[in-house]
Amino acid sequence: MDIELSYKAKQVMANCIAMAEQAFKRSFPIPSLTFNVRGKAAGKAYLQLNEIRLNPKLFKENPQAFLKEVIPHEVAHLIAYQVYGRVRPHGKEWQGVMEAVFKVPAKTTHSFDVASVQGKTFEYRCGCMTYPLSIRRHNKVLRKEAVYSCQKCRQPLSFTGTQLS
């Protein structure tokens, strides 16, 4: 991971913690930060470990969005857990931390271009449309561990034989 980006990420994390300490009038431990999330997820918060993991490839491609949105998003999960205990991941407690404490819109998903991190996908079909399935889901179908169904017509999806990416 780029040293400068890593430093900026830690600064943003520390600023978020400082804002939370001021808002809740208590101290919070500084979370550990790693850069080992893969796939399409931008980041993950591990509540019991007080750890934030970020996707290094998406971070390098979208540094400003990570610093302004993704890192506060993940820190807000940790703060909500430490203040309120087990709550819904994007529930009112988390939204309150995002909007009232961090002054960041409480968005639950990112809109980054994921072409550089997207794994292989395979085309599946039902009675009304086609679906791209990830390699993980495709392999579960092949091993007969899962059957996926269309959300519209409820028919089981079947592999067309085409790899999309």
UniProtKB/Swiss-Prot annotation:
InterPro entries: SprT-like_domain, SprT_Zn_ribbon, Uncharacterised_SprT. The active site is at E74. It comes from the Bacteria. The keyword Chloroplast does not apply. Zn(2+) binds at H73, H77. One of its GO terms (cellular component) is cytoplasm. Its cofactor is Zn(2+). GO terms for molecular function: zinc ion binding. Belongs to the SprT family. This is Protein SprT. It comes from Vibrio campbellii (strain ATCC BAA-1116). The lineage of its organism: Bacteria, Pseudomonadati, Pseudomonadota, Gammaproteobacteria, Vibrionales.
